[in-house]
A protein has these predicted regions:
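RNase H-like, metal-dependent nuclease domains and their acidic two-metal-ion catalytic environment used
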Residues: 1-188, 227-277
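Short alpha-helix plus adjacent loop in nuclease-associated cores
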Residues: 185-234
Length: 277
C-alpha cells in the first residue's frame, strides 16, 4: 500500500480470496483502531475462591492475564449453577455460550503448536447483557494442557454458560465430565440426541472432521459478519451508519485470513464459529 494508516493496514491484502466479507471485517478493524481499548476491554484471569476447586470462580483484572473480556455479568448472574438430579448445569444458558478450540498434548516439539482458543458470545436476551456480541477472547497455550482445561472450565462456571468443543480432542471434554460438569458441554447441535454416537452422548462436543460441520461452522461466521460486523450499508440488519460491535482484533484478523481447507492454524476462527453455532 502506498499510504497505510496503520501497521496492520500496511500489510493488508484485500485482493486475496477470503471466505468472509473482508470489507466489513476491515471496516471493523479500522474502527477499533480508533478506540481506546482500555475503556472497552479488560484483561484478567480466573481463579477458584480461596484456591478451592469447584466452589465459586473469582475474576481478577490482571495485566498478565490470558483472558480479555468486554462484559462481565452482574453479581447475581455470576457462578450461576443449576443442580438437576445431582448434576451441574449452566444457569445462564439463555444469555450465551462458549466455543472452544482445544488441544490435547502439552508440549510441541517442532515449531510452534497451535494455541488453544476460547470465545464467548451472547445471544439475543432480555437480561442485563449485550445481545449477539462476543464478550470473551482467550487465545493461549499455557505450559500444560491441564492449565488450559482448568481455565476454560473456570470461565464456563463464572459466566454460567455451556461450551461447544470439538470432540476429536477429547481431553477437555473428559476434564469437564470427570469434574462433574458434563452438563456444561453442549451436544452437537446438528443432530438429535438419539442419533448421537456413544461417545457423543457421554461427552458432548462436535466432530470437526465432517464436511457438513466445516460448512455450517463457516456459514455461522459468515452470517455473523454480515449481521454484526462493520457497516451495514444496505440497512438490512441495522441502521446503515451503525458500526458493528466486535472488539476482538485477533479474532477479526483470524477471520480475514481463514482458509476452510486448512483450518488448523485458525484457533480464534474455530472457537468463535463454534460459539456462534
Amino acid at each position: 500500500r502506498q499510504f497505510p494508516r496503520t501497521e496492520s493496514h500496511a500489510f493488508r491484502d484485500e485482493s486475496k480470496q477470503s471466505l468472509f466479507n473482508l470489507t466489513k471485517i476491515y471496516q471493523q478493524i479500522d474502527y477499533n483502531d480508533t478506540l481506546i481499548m482500555g475503556q472497552h476491554m479488560t484483561q484478567g484471569s480466573f481463579s477458584w475462591h480461596n484456591g478451592v476447586k469447584d466452589t465459586r470462580v473469582i475474576w481478577t483484572p490482571d495485566k498478565r492475564g490470558r483472558f480479555f473480556v468486554t462484559w462481565l455479568p452482574e453479581n447475581a448472574l455470576q457462578n450461576n449453577v443449576i443442580i438437576k438430579n445431582g448434576k451441574k448445569y449452566p444457569g445462564n444458558e439463555h444469555i450465551g455460550s462458549f466455543g472452544c478450540d482445544s488441544y490435547d498434548i502439552s508440549g510441541v516439539v517442532v515449531g510452534k503448536g497451535s494455541n488453544g482458543a476460547l470465545s464467548g458470545m451472547t445471544k439475543f436476551n432480555m437480561d442485563n447483557a449485550p445481545s449477539n456480541e462476543f464478550f470473551l477472547e482467550y487465545i493461549a497455550r499455557p505450559q500444560t494442557a491441564e492449565i488450559f482445561f482448568e481455565e476454560v472450565l473456570m470461565a464456563c462456571v463464572f459466566f454460567g454458560m455451556p461450551i461447544l468443543c470439538e470432540n476429536n480432542k477429547p481431553r477437555l471434554l473428559y476434564h469437564f465430565k470427570n469434574r462433574g460438569y458434563r452438563g456444561y458441554s453442549i451436544n452437537r447441535p446438528d443432530k438429535t440426541f438419539n442419533k448421537l454416537s456413544k461417545t457423543e452422548k457421554e461427552l458432548g462436543g462436535i466432530p470437526n472432521s465432517s464436511e457438513d460441520v466445516k460448512q455450517s461452522h463457516a456459514s455461522a461466521i459468515e452470517s455473523y459478519i454480515e449481521k454484526h460486523v462493520g457497516l451495514d450499508l444496505v440497512g438490512n440488519y441495522r441502521d446503515s451508519d451503525d458500526m458493528g460491535i466486535m472488539y476482538f482484533q485477533n479474532t477479526l484478523e483470524d477471520w480475514a485470513k481463514f482458509d476452510i481447507n486448512n483450518r488448523t492454524k485458525f484457533d480464534a476462527s474455530i472457537s468463535s464459529g463454534l460459539a456462534i453455532m
